[in-house]
Amino acid sequence: MSESVLLDEIFTVTSVDKQKYQRVSRITAVSGQNDMNLTLDINSQIYPLEKDATFSLQITSNLNSPDLKEAADYIMYGKVYRVEEAKDEKVSVYVSFGGLLMAIEGSHRKLYRLSLDHVYLLLRR
């Protein structure tokens, strides 16, 4: 894993909520090992996801590697605005991508590299 890659996981969509806004869906997903939970707002017109879809999620500090950009189907730039301790030695990290929000909860061992800073989110099927 590249030094700029802060998180690299495979997730499966457990639900899709399309009710809030046009062209925006809020998905909930669980990682392949069921140790991380994700809630993510996405532009469903550009990158539609359905229940039970599997996708790769990477969070990086930069896009200096051309391989990262070329492999991704959907990229967002945002800011980690809150990191808090959750129950059972878990951490919750909150990111805003220009109003599209992400919350991810998981083990401190996997999320420790995410801090209050700007990040890139890369998704691919």
UniProtKB/Swiss-Prot annotation:
Could you tell me what this protein is called?
A: DNA-directed RNA polymerases I, II, and III subunit RPABC3
Q: Which segments carry the region annotation Non-specific ssDNA binding?
A: 17-39
The alphabetized list of GO BP terms reads:
transcription by RNA polymerase II; transcription by RNA polymerase III; transcription elongation by RNA polymerase I
MF terms (GO), sorted A to Z: DNA binding; DNA-directed RNA polymerase activity
Q: Which family does it belong to?
A: Belongs to the eukaryotic RPB8 RNA polymerase subunit family.
**Subunit (UniProt):** Component of the RNA polymerase I (Pol I), RNA polymerase II (Pol II) and RNA polymerase III (Pol III) complexes consisting of 14, 12 and 17 subunits, respectively. Directly interacts with POLR2A.
> Which species is the source of this protein?
Schizosaccharomyces pombe (strain 972 / ATCC 24843) (Fission yeast)
Q: What does this protein do?
A: DNA-dependent RNA polymerase catalyzes the transcription of DNA into RNA using the four ribonucleoside triphosphates as substrates. Common component of RNA polymerases I, II and III which synthesize ribosomal RNA precursors, mRNA precursors and many functional non-coding RNAs, and small RNAs, such as 5S rRNA and tRNAs, respectively.
